[in-house]
Amino acid sequence: MWFSWNNTEQSIAVRQGYQVLAEYQLIEQEQLKNIYVIPSYASALHWFGVIFIHSGFYAGSMFRFSIILPDNFPNGTSLPTIIFTTTCYHPHIRPQTQSLDLAPFFTGWRKDHYHVWHLLKYIQAIFADPEGSISATVTPSGDRVCLEEAYNMDALAMLSNDRVAFIKKVQELALFTKKHMYDKPTSNDPHYIVIEPFCSERHTKIMEQLKSPSWKEATSMDTSPPAQCLARIDSSRQMDEEEAKQSAKLFAKNGKAAAALQ
């Protein structure tokens, strides 16, 4: 009996691993810019993430975050947990825990409707249009009616009543994130995203490897096991890329991020 139960548990874990891999492949298909995630080596349910912001109130910021998927993911209705490991000042981020409020868009998880890339677009949306993210409704005259409650009430009040002070505060944090961009990794997980200054010598070497026939042959084999590699980002190049100004609001008039995420 124990042997049968153990095999069942193992098969569930394997199936879940393939489902998580499928989520990662969907993210690649979306081709999201300036936001990067990867499942940790230790657990497929714990993802490392980083977002670079080039425009708006948070321009120049770099925030790290973790995505914790529920144990029964993608089944059930429990929402994933998103924790920022870089200090963020935002109405939807709880100051004590740095956890992100998903309620403005997600009422519950539905595997046939939501994917991890929806979470990433939501993260992008709240930083791209923080004012839109706190709008509960819009009056016929076009005035926004702000939410009455949020994870960070201080940030909500400041953004609603003193826009200049809010921008000043988040820009101070942006400078802080730049200063600590190259700090040593806080995790020894092989998949932890490491950010290093752009190195032309390393870049050239990698490009030559990609052109190599032996490299193409090795990476095209479907049976190859996943490599234990350290994810790296050449941040100088990423930070120099300027995003085009958004042509439409990321939030629907009801204050929810539906327009940005569908």
Swiss-Prot record:
Residues 15-179 form the UBC core domain. Disulfide bonds: none annotated. SMART domains: UBCc (SM00212). This is Protein crossbronx-like. CDD domains: UEV_AKTIP (cd23814). Belongs to the ubiquitin-conjugating enzyme family. FTS subfamily.
